[in-house]
């Protein structure tokens, strides 16, 4: 009895499962840590929280970079979830591809907008 392993094996489907599950967990942890850092800065600051305080928190380059890294992580987190929804629930390939392309364009636009907001371009 011959066993057909290796390069002749037929694999069906995308099989993103474990990688995407891990990616969403890593991005979720990164977003949670960012929330803790942001809350610590807000809670440890003296005086009322106003525009000047918020602008001061996000004025340093390391905070801008950290915020942008978290935004990119969140956009990837969103992409994995939306792609899974489109793949699971939208059966016509043309509609699914259109929705995926629209999602990518929208998320890239959100990243560009985040750059404009953070660095006031």
Describe the residue ranges of each PLM region.
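Membrane-embedded alpha-helical bundles that constitute the cytochrome b-like, heme-associated redox core
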Residues: 1-121
């Amino acid at each position: 009895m011959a066993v057909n392993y290796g390069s002749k094996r037929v694999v069906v489907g995308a099989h993103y499962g474990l990688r995407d599950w891990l990616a969403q967990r890593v991005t979720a942890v990164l977003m949670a840590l960012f929330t803790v850092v942001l809350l610590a800065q807000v809670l440890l600051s003296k005086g009322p929280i106003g525009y000047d305080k918020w602008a001061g928190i996000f004025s340093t380059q390391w905070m801008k970079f950290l915020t942008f890294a978290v935004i990119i992580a969140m956009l990837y987190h969103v992409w994995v979830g939306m792609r899974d929804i489109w793949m699971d629930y939208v059966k016509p390939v043309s509609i699914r591809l259109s929705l995926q392309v629209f999602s990518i364009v929208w998320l890239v636009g959100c990243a560009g907008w985040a750059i404009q907001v953070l660095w006031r371009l």
